Amino acid sequence: RFGCSQPRGEEKTTTEGVGSEQRCERSPDAIVPESAVVSADPVPDDRILENALATVYEYTDKDLGDAVDGTNRQILRRRLLYLACMAPVPNDVPQVRLRHDRVSYGDLCHYGWNVWNAFKGATNRFYDQTELAEWLKASFESLAKYNTKTLRAKLRATDGGYRIRLIDNLKEYIQK
């Protein structure tokens, strides 16, 4: 589900005009250029989910900003879009590669929990924590070696010194 689907034949799965400065109406984030949004990408189905996605993007920039370069930031935003819309991530979306192991696997689990919590609050239906752990494993190259049960157990762990803390309200957190 989180990186194992094949696009349908009629779907466009490549980006054209990379480097275009135009903005895309389909992107809930005005910063993402049209070239980064593929026509087959899902679209949030309501304003509440769009707002949650924008909040998650800001949170990602705040807490993971120094750990991802521009390319990996776009990859992560695309993966977050699929997560928010509860859509399978196409195989052509690569995993996110972090810089120099600046973020521990426990921190990524906390990051995932915070993102999940924001999306869960924006919709009546959302993935369970095991599915979130699967998404984390499929999304981050550094988590591929861990099993899903281990990642799920770390989602709300408080047993160590984590740089990324658990946050109940992302909107309030990013405004600080």
Predicted feature descriptions by range:
Residues R8-K176:
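Flexible coil/loop and intrinsically disordered linker positions at secondary-structure junctions
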